[in-house]
Amino acid sequence: MRFCLVFIRLAAFVILSGGATSTTTDNDDTRLLQTSNIETAAVANVLHVMQSSESSKRLLRLNDQADISGHDEERSSLIEKGWKKLRKLIKKVWKYVKKPFKKTAKIIKKPFKSRTKNIHIVYYKSRF
């Protein structure tokens, strides 16, 4: 139960603090993967936390190639898949959260502006 709450807060923190540059490492591959796109960095970090390192590496590679070779559509579909995974995980874990916490927690949606569309970030605000 406590692990679920910690994981939700970790995922929300990773999304919100994606920053301007993201660096992810993989145990199989020692190379560092970097990107300067904020929403791509956030989704890549969440995917990496969710043990989808292959999707994470592919997303970062596509982000680097998007401006040059026109992979923007494939990149946006990978970003959307990452958000869907995160939403499903939050819904799955949310039913195990204790009722007193549910009363103090608020689900807040804020638009996150990107080049093409708004991406809604869901994070949890509590009294802790």
Swiss-Prot record:
Induction: Expression is up-regulated during the early plant infection stages. Residues 1-22 form the signal peptide. GO terms for cellular component: extracellular region; host cell nucleus; host cell plasma membrane; membrane. A motif (RxLR-dEER) lies at residues 58-75. It comes from the Eukaryota. It is found in: Secreted; Host cell membrane; Host nucleus. The keyword Membrane applies. Keywords: Host cell membrane, Host membrane, Host nucleus, Membrane, Secreted, Signal, Virulence. Coiled coil: none annotated. Its main location: secreted. Secreted effector that suppresses pattern-triggered immunity (PTI) in plant host. The RxLR-dEER motif acts to carry the protein into the host cell cytoplasm through binding to cell surface phosphatidylinositol-3-phosphate. Belongs to the RxLR effector family. This is Secreted RxLR effector protein RXLR-C09. It comes from Plasmopara halstedii (Downy mildew of sunflower). The lineage of its organism: Eukaryota, Sar, Stramenopiles, Oomycota, Peronosporales.
